[in-house]
UniProtKB/Swiss-Prot annotation:
Belongs to the UPF0342 family. This is UPF0342 protein SPN23F13380. It comes from Streptococcus pneumoniae (strain ATCC 700669 / Spain 23F-1). Gene3D superfamilies: YheA/YmcA-like (1.20.1500.10). Pfam families: Com_YlbF (PF06133).
């Protein structure tokens, strides 16, 4: 019987081999090579982190956060590199969601 960690590492290698993973990586590399896209992307990630910190402390984002989010949405839609990255990321997320269901199925069975 194989070690469960070996299986997890094999899954990790399998994910890296997916065309969708490679497409996300290529899109991220393209962002890194473009100064404007890279700046927006970095600012967006910092903003997302700020929202997550608020959520962890039980605070709700105020109206300024909503306005800032809308601004980022417009910037992302207006930049083909960023738009492509997030589209490719959504395609990869389908695999991750399916894998999550498979991995956590035994745990959910224990709770029934």
């Amino acid at each position: 019987m194989s070690n469960i960690y070996d299986s997890a590492n094999e899954l990790s290698r399998g994910l890296r081999g997916l065309p969708e993973y490679k497409a996300v990586k290529a899109a991220k590399d393209a962002i890194a090579a473009d100064a404007e896209a890279s700046k927006i992307f970095t600012e967006y990630l910092a903003f997302q982190e700020e929202i997550q910190k608020l959520a962890h402390t039980g605070q709700m984002p105020d109206a300024s956060f909503q306005a800032k989010m809308e601004g980022f949405g417009k910037q992302i839609q207006g930049n083909s590199l960023l738009s492509e990255f997030f589209t490719k990321q959504q395609q990869l997320a389908i695999y991750l969601s399916d894998i999550e269901k498979i991995v956590f199925e035994p745990v959910s069975e224990l709770l029934k």
